[in-house]
Amino acid sequence: AQSVPWGISRVQAPAAHNRGLTGSGVKVAVLDTGISTHPDLNIRGGASFVPGEPSTQDGNGHGTHVAGTIAALNNSIGVLGVAPSAELYAVKVLGADGRGAISSIAQGLEWAGNNGMHVANLSLGSPSPSATLEQAVNSATSRGVLVVAASGNSGASSISYPARYANAMAVGATDQNNNRASFSQYGAGLDIVAPGVNVQSTYPGSTYASLNGTSMATPHVAGAAALVKQKNPSWSNVQIRNHLKNTATSLGSTNLYGSGLVNAEAATR
């Protein structure tokens, strides 16, 4: 049987699905540790930019989990994603150890721009700025990619990079009570929040796992972006980003929550 993870319900994705909005025709690149073949995922393509790891299969688990929150299939098994018909692309920029070079991430963003991706999910970050990475985010954005990135997990009152860059949409994490997760980085530049605690999703070995992190929050927003893009195919990445913020459910302090909790129902009305 298929279960609907709490975060998918909380962002009201099923209401969008009931309107026929499932992310169909929208290309979403997952810049991560790769994505493992899984019965609850449909992976359309991708590329690896990790030296020594030519396969886009996931030797870590992180990328497969992120991918499921975006687009786990609406079938009779496992879990359900925010945009179950979105086209998933596995862009490996982090190795099996979960670490990656700035150059790899920049190449992944370049690939997303070159290959017509509508959304790029970056559930990754660093406390240090990088001109190379900022340029890559700006270039991908100029080519129509909506770059969605995790705020970071140190609990600090500042946002990680690349999420902090103006052209990246920074996503923080909330818990089941719609409170900021204790680990979720916040402050200037935070755009929006989404569920990031006890998030159930796909995992390598045709299994499922529950994980915590702003990495888990980010794909809820990437998935919602795919729903909005299907409904409004002519909209630019900037229009989609602004619409997601304008339709978010306010949770109070913009410092802690940005525009609030992403709301797929309001965003697809």
Swiss-Prot record:
Ca(2+) 2 binds at A163, Y165, A168. Its main location: secreted. Keywords: Calcium, Hydrolase, Metal-binding, Protease, Secreted, Serine protease, Sporulation. Secretion of subtilisin is associated with onset of sporulation, and many mutations which block sporulation at early stages affect expression levels of subtilisin. However, subtilisin is not necessary for normal sporulation. One of its GO terms (cellular component) is extracellular region. Its cofactor is Ca(2+). It catalyses: Hydrolysis of proteins with broad specificity for peptide bonds, and a preference for a large uncharged residue in P1. Hydrolyzes peptide amides. Its EC number is 3.4.21.62. It holds the Pfam family Peptidase_S8. Belongs to the peptidase S8 family. The active site is at D32, H62, S215. Ca(2+) 1 binds at Q2, D40, L73, N75, I77, V79. This is Subtilisin BL. It is an enzyme of class 3 (hydrolase). Binds 2 calcium ions per subunit. GO terms for molecular function: metal ion binding; serine-type endopeptidase activity. Subtilisin is an extracellular alkaline serine protease, it catalyzes the hydrolysis of proteins and peptide amides. Residues 5-268 form the Peptidase S8 domain. GO terms for biological process: proteolysis; sporulation resulting in formation of a cellular spore. It is found in: Secreted. CDD domains: Peptidases_S8_Subtilisin_subset (cd07477).
